[in-house]
């Protein structure tokens, strides 16, 4: 056979050579067809317009010319528009500010070029309070009370300094006693050290520490630049002036992609709050310590630049310090504006009011750092051009560092090495390696803005003037920024004010909710293992090395991996409190799940925290001060010569007759929390040796508590407790569907699958897409075409239980995908019932009905379903409803021989009668198809 093929080829080749080769372009191509998809990668084709004429036949055009071409099109991801939830109810009227608020959340951030959300998430309105304003005044005891309510030491009265901030401590003074023998100026820019810092936004916010307060102490520090010392504020432990400009501290770093900026161990910042909610954020650093700029324009600019081509980045940075500082560990003097904001917070938790603290003052404060500036540029290079240059990563970093020393710092002794000017990339740009970069992103901080802007590099520019860097360096001394800093949570500053413990607890709760708004778990997975990051209400994709495009959808020629790394989904809502007064929550590695050898998610799957209870729940939140925070466990233990200490109850259990010490022979009774029942002997007896005689006893869960869901969702059936094995269904108002699974089952100690606290309703995309078309179709101009399972079904739709006749198996499928495939003539799929596949009568009848349907003469579409001979379609519910046996037609070709109930006699029934009897769940045995023989 092989020899015959070779001979045929030789003969064909000889004939072609003998004749004239076909000029295929003689037959023009048609226009490319429209793309099969508008997004998410489709295909289009074109055909050659063949005319079988003499030329075509004589020149073997049939064998030579391709008649059809296909290409990929519209590979960009479908845009996801930002979706805001509805406003919740108005909060109670705050009696102190006479305002109330309502809040809504971002249900879905925008992504892949979708429309962003611009409307506010919080609304305020004036109101008439029904309660008195409960702003507690500080108990100054032996201290002086300022008009503002602040307490200061008595020794600070009449010292000629405004220690109160409102000058009330210097009023009605006969004589004043100066603290210092002469007047000293404050440290330049000392107020910057007292600003708050928003860790999630990566920028300083309002003043939280009053660094004009000196505390009646005359402590000074001297700078080498001036002869006059500066006064040191009371909040600072140490201050040291220095000017650091050494040339050899110029650092360079190489990044194959921007994801390594966020995942490198030495450069990773993580945000955490009380309760353990944490996630990593990409950061840029100055030297040893971290500075987060995740959400500012520089990082966004870098991401957008990386989308245009497969890129690598070289970062060069140099730190110039003017002074170093360390903040005191305790007894810090808060700024008036921050103190006033804290004092006006209500005792009752109000998410909107408490979250404003973080908007205005940030999430952290500076515990140490430096004032100065940072020369910092991030150069973007084409990965392909860097590879073709012949330089290694270390050599490329070295060339950027050497050229920066020569062309920016104008270091006199810098020698440019031969390899940095003669490689293939530098040769294209007159010996300059930096000129081969695509662009640079400026991360310069400190100094006057016009000098900082002049240091930024632009492609094609002639270079910097020699004085540019020195001018910026001088301006850093007058206009420094806080750099190389360390942070502590701003919540730690809430001490020694009225109701400090109550407000600290409320702020921790608010910070946990506030931080969740920045968690990229809300984003859809990015193509090619891109890492999503949330910027405001927009999700951006940070591309892996070897990928690029607006959403990382394009691959460089040498990118071969098809693995999908796992990413965390969002946390579930907190569970109810157990017997140890703790609650927990979980998350799943499913956004996306690891596929084709991809990495598993790093981090914890489950978190646990202590529960808090209000002992005055009906009287509002109590005011607890710092010196009043005591728990029962802090009470001294009672020592006795005989008896037994309190025993440890089983998990999810408690002691009914609880006390600290029990007499010999005394019994304790073990009871279980709601939703649990006692299994075993529930009495312990105190023995003379101080131990307990106890049998095996445990609290086994028997019920799940009704989950907490958003108001727009309806729970069916609605009850307080559900036994193990019971299920609930979540539904939405007409025109909306649940934006996630709708069915949940009580299993073990939780609901399965976990119920997300962000679960809500969204517009029914199926209804919107189909327009005036049938289910499974969408409107395209004036025509109805089948929906694409991949393109049109990326949104959530309700679950259906479906049977596949090819695999002879049933499975749960999204409704949209089922309808789209059914429209595309996928006849092997059969609807069983709404909801996920669960063992039981509904599934059994669905499978039996599918087997019986193969012989049905009637097949009428009805919603998701198809009605058969023994059914009719209900117009009101779009569901198939079984007929009664007398409503069936008589006779017919599809007959069966059956036995009814416990009867031994045989009976012939048609397919309609068989279907109605089995639908009513009456006992019947089908003996064989056709009439009974007897």
Swiss-Prot record:
Annotated glycosylation sites: 29, 32, 38, 90, 324, 392, 568, 571, 574, 855
UniProt region (C5b-binding domain), positions on chain: 642-934
Stated consequence of mutating residue 119 to E: In allotype C6 A
Pfam families referenced in this protein's UniProt entry, alphabetically: EGF_C8A_B_C6 (PF21195), Kazal_C6 (PF21288), Ldl_recept_a (PF00057), MACPF (PF01823), Sushi (PF00084), TSP_1 (PF00090)
Factor I module (FIM) 2: annotated segments: 858-934
Alphabetized UniProt keyword annotations: Complement pathway, Cytolysis, Disulfide bond, EGF-like domain, Glycoprotein, Immunity, Innate immunity, Membrane, Membrane attack complex, Repeat, Secreted, Signal, Sushi, Target cell membrane, Target membrane, Transmembrane, Transmembrane beta strand
Domain MACPF stretches: 176-522
Domain Sushi: 642-701, 702-763
Binding positions for Ca(2+) per the UniProt entry: 156, 159, 161, 163, 169-170
PTM (free text): All cysteine residues are assumed to be cross-linked to one another. Individual modules containing an even number of conserved cysteine residues are supposed to have disulfide linkages only within the same module.
Cysteines engaged in disulfide bonds, as pairs: 22-61, 24-65, 35-73, 39-78, 82-117, 93-127, 96-133, 140-151, 146-164, 158-173, 180-218, 399-420, 499-623, 521-570, 523-539, 526-541, 543-552, 577-611, 589-601, 644-686, 672-699, 704-746, 732-761, 773-823, 784-801, 786-837, 793-816, 862-873, 867-919, 880-897, 882-932, 888-912
Regulation: Membrane attack complex (MAC) assembly is inhibited by CD59, thereby protecting self-cells from damage during complement activation. MAC assembly is also inhibited by clusterin (CLU) chaperones that inhibit polymerization of C9.
Positions of the TSP type-1 domain: 22-79, 81-134, 565-612
Occurrences of domain LDL-receptor class A (ranges): 138-175
Highest taxon in the source lineage: Eukaryota
Subunit field text: Component of the membrane attack complex (MAC), composed of complement C5b, C6, C7, C8A, C8B, C8G and multiple copies of the pore-forming subunit C9.
Disease: Complement component 6 deficiency: A rare defect of the complement classical pathway associated with susceptibility to severe recurrent infections, predominantly by Neisseria gonorrhoeae or Neisseria meningitidis.
Protein name as it appears in the record: Complement component C6
């Amino acid at each position: 056979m092989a020899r015959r093929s070779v001979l045929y080829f030789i003969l064909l080749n000889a004939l072609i050579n003998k004749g004239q080769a076909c000029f295929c372009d003689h037959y023009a191509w048609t226009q490319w067809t429209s793309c099969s998809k508008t997004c998410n990668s489709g295909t289009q084709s074109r055909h050659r317009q063949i005319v079988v004429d003499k030329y075509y036949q004589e020149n073997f055009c049939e064998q030579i010319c391709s008649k059809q071409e296909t290409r990929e099109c519209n590979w960009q991801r479908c845009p996801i528009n930002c979706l805001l939830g509805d406003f919740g109810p108005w909060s109670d009227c705050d009696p102190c500010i006479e305002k109330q608020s309502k809040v809504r959340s971002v249900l879905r951030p925008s992504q892949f070029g979708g429309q962003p959300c611009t409307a506010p998430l919080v609304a305020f309105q004036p109101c008439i309070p029904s309660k008195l304003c409960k702003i507690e005044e500080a108990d100054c005891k032996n201290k002086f009370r300022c008009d503002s309510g602040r307490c200061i030491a008595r020794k600070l009265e009449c010292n000629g300094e405004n220690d109160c901030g409102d000058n009330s401590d210097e009023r009605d003074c006969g004589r004043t006693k100066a603290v210092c023998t002469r007047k000293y100026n404050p440290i330049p820019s000392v107020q910057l050290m007292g600003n708050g810092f928003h860790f999630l936004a990566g920028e300083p916010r309002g003043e939280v520490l009053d660094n004009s307060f000196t505390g009646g102490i005359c402590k000074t520090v001297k700078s080498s630049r001036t002869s006059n010392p500066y006064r040191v504020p009371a909040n600072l432990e140490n201050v040291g002036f220095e000017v650091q400009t050494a040339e050899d501290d110029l650092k360079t770093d190489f990044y194959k992609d921007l994801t390594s900026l966020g995942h490198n161990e030495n450069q990773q910042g993580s945000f955490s709050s009380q309760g353990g909610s944490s996630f990593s954020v990409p950061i840029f650093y100055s030297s040893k310590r971290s500075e987060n700029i995740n959400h500012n324009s520089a990082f966004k600019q870098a991401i957008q630049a990386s989308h245009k081509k497969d890129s690598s980045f070289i970062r060069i940075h140099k730190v110039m310090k003017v002074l170093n500082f360390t903040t005191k560990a305790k007894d810090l003097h808060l700024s008036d504006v921050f103190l006033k904001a804290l004092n006006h917070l209500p005792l009752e938790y109000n998410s909107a009011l408490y979250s404003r603290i973080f908007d205005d003052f940030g999430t952290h404060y500076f515990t140490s750092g430096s004032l100065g500036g940072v020369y910092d540029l991030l150069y973007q290079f084409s990965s392909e051009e860097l590879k073709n240059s012949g330089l290694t990563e270390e050599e490329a970093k070295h060339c950027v560092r050497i050229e920066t020393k020569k062309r920016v710092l104008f270091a006199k002794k810098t020698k440019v090495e031969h390899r940095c000017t003669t490689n293939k990339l530098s040769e294209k740009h007159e010996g300059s390696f930096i000129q081969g970069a695509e662009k640079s992103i400026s991360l310069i901080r400190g100094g006057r803005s016009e000098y900082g802007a002049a240091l930024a590099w632009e492609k094609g520019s002639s270079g910097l003037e020699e004085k540019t860097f020195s001018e910026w360096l001088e301006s850093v001394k007058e206009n420094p920024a806080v750099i190389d800093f360390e942070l502590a949570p701003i919540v730690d500053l809430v001490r020694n004010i009225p109701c400090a413990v109550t407000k600290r607890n409320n702020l921790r709760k608010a910070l946990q909710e506030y931080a969740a708004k920045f968690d990229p778990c809300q984003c859809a997975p990015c193509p090619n293992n891109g890492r999503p990051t949330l910027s405001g209400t927009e999700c951006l994709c940070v591309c892996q090395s070897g990928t690029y495009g607006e959403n990382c959808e394009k691959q460089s020629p040498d990118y071969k991996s098809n693995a999908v790394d796992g990413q965390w989904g969002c946390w579930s809502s907190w569970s109810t409190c157990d017997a140890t007064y703790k609650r927990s929550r979980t998350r799943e590695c499913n956004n996306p799940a690891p596929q084709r050898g991809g990495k598993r998610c790093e981090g914890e799957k489950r978190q646990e925290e202590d529960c808090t209870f209000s002992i005055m729940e009906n009287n509002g939140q109590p005011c607890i001060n710092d010196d009043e925070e005591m728990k029962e466990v802090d009470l001294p233990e009672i020592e006795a010569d005989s008896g037994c200490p309190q025993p440890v109850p089983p998990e999810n259990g408690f002691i009914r007759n609880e006390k600290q010490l029990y007499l010999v022979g005394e019994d304790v009774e073990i009871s279980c929390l709601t939703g649990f029942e006692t299994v075993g002997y529930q009495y312990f007896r105190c023995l003379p040796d101080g131990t307990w005689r106890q049998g095996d006893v445990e609290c086994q869960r028997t019920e799940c508590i009704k989950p907490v869901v958003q108001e727009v969702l309806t729970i069916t059936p609605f009850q307080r407790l559900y036994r193990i094995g019971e299920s609930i269904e979540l539904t939405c108002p007409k025109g909306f569907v649940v934006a996630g699974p709708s069915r949940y089952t009580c299993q073990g100690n939780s609901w399965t699958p976990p119920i997300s606290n962000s679960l809500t309703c969204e517009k029914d995309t199926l209804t919107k897409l189909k327009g005036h078309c049938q289910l499974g179709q969408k409107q395209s101009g004036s025509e109805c075409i089948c929906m694409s399972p991949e393109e049109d079904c990326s949104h959530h739709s309700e679950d259906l239980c479906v049977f596949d006749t090819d695999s002879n198996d049933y499975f749960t499928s999204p409704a949209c995908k089922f309808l789209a495939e059914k429209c595309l003539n996928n006849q092997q799929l059969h609807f069983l019932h709404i909801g996920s596949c669960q063992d039981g009568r509904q599934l059994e009848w669905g499978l039996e009905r599918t087997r019986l349907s193969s012989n049905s003469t009637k097949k009428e579409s009805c919603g998701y379903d198809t009605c058969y001979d023994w059914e009719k379609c209900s117009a009101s519910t779009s569901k198939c409803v079984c007929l009664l046996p007398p409503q069936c037609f008589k006779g017919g070709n599809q007959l069966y021989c059956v036995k009814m109930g416990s009867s031994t006699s045989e009976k012939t029934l048609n397919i309609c009668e068989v279907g109605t009897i089995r639908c009513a769940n009456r006992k019947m045995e089908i003996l064989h198809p056709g009439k009974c023989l007897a």
